[in-house]
């Protein structure tokens, strides 16, 4: 696949099809940082849903210069992968974001958009073809950039006060069985026992501290009340690890 990068007046070849048995195509997005990034900066994979009424409108937005948004890849409903921005350039997909001590995940991540109307336009299950393609693409990227399991995140993990994607229908548990991302291994009986316990202020604070330890940011938007922000963080955690509560 050839990327004709008008901004930097160069051509980059990324032949995914030789590394993966999946269909890929190219649809150039002009929305990325002009400066090429070092491979060592790529430590995260961020999953998103497109959150638009139609797939075509999502593709148009990701490739329109006025939108000032992009991702490295988009996975269509039929499982076909569109390459939008080369991995070696910073795409504009994370926005205001934070994880652990990092503020601004764009520079350090690969962004993958998955076609889905999202919560505003009729959120639906992701198709089997989409997930199959996502698994193959993720394995390729994990191997190439040595991405750790705990560095595979959703947009809502790094921007809990702003984003809900990829949402509670995203199959994190299924992906973890393919060595993509984390999932708790605690016994279900123990989980039920713990969940039946009443939570007091002390245990609530301990729970929040553990979320911050995992990586959820203490960063606070000055316009958002602290307690409200904490609720956003808890909801982000639940969307991923306890989706049945959402």
Listing of model-derived features with the role each one plays in the protein:
Residues 4-5, 14-16:
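Short hydrophobic targeting helices and cationic amphipathic motifs
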Residues 19-150:
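Active-site-adjacent loop/helix surface patches within enzyme catalytic domains
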Residues 118, 123-220, 232, 236-239:
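Basic/polar, cationic surfaces and motifs that engage anionic cell-wall
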Residues 224-226:
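Short basic-aromatic helix/loop recognition motifs at nucleic-acid
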